[in-house]
Amino acid sequence: MSRRDGSGGRASAGRTGKPDQKGKLLDMSATPPLLEIKDLHVSAEDGAILRGVDLIVGAGEVHALMGPNGAGKSTLAGALLGHPAYTVTQGSISLNGEDVTAWATDVRAKAGLFLAFQYPEAIEGVSVTQFLRQAMAARKGTEVSVLEVRVLMTEWMERLGMDSSFASRHLNQGFSGGEKKRNEILQMALLEPLVAVLDETDSGLDIDALRVVGRGVAAVRAERPALGVLAITHYERLLTELVPDVVHVLVSGRVVASGGPEVAAQIESSGYEAWR
């Protein structure tokens, strides 16, 4: 049975303790959630899109957000990072206890909010290595050596099944859909965010590429067990790899239900009719 609590009741219980990779409990009871969205209303040029979204992601939790086309999923992702196309008209977004609703996009990113784009932009003339070095320096607030970047890139590219030549290619220039998504996961690994928002990362991937991405996310979480993940998707297939703690259903700009993986299975079998 799914919950009608958009904050994800199972998730709040999970913050009292979650085992790390050595079996020790992470003490999460005294800390604020990593990501807290309260009564979020968002508009664009065409009018209101989100109409009161409530959602909480705690440390070490994986949340999935599913919904039909036009529900507002990608709008939520854009609003979380402060995309100028969207205006927050009511409500708030908090990152690790700090209200970031009015913060600029780059400030949110430096604070630890990461978005894996549905359609990453190509940047001609800037190599993947150059981009990641600049991004890591911005995130850490200090210079990062080329050697440090290359060592980390080599390790993670092997984990993600990426060819070594990838490092010198121009960012997303001529990349296949799968290469773009692998690059997004590579960025997530090196930038070490507090919260990673995956905006339809499974879009355009075949089953093998999907498995690599899913396992790549799992590998990042194994290295950093406190990482919070919000995966936005149309399909249950990504969730077989990510295994979410909570699945939320977004319809007409509102979270209308939250529950466990059984919610995704229900959507896969019968669609969104139960919540329309």
What residue ranges belong to the model's regions?
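Conserved structural motif at the start of ABC-family nucleotide-binding domains
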Residues: 35-37, 49-52
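Conserved hydrophobic segment flanking the Walker A/P-loop of ABC-type ATPase nucleotide-binding domains
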Residues: 44, 53, 57-59
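The feature captures the beta-strand-to-loop junction immediately N-terminal to the Walker
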Residues: 66-68
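ABC ATPase NBD Q-loop/coupling interface
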Residues: 92-108, 172
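Q-loop/switch helix immediately C-terminal to the Walker
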Residues: 115, 119, 125-140, 152
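ABC ATPase C-loop
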Residues: 188-189
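Walker B catalytic motif
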Residues: 197-201, 208
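Conserved beta-strand-loop-alpha-helix hinge in the C-terminal portion
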Residues: 246, 250, 254-276
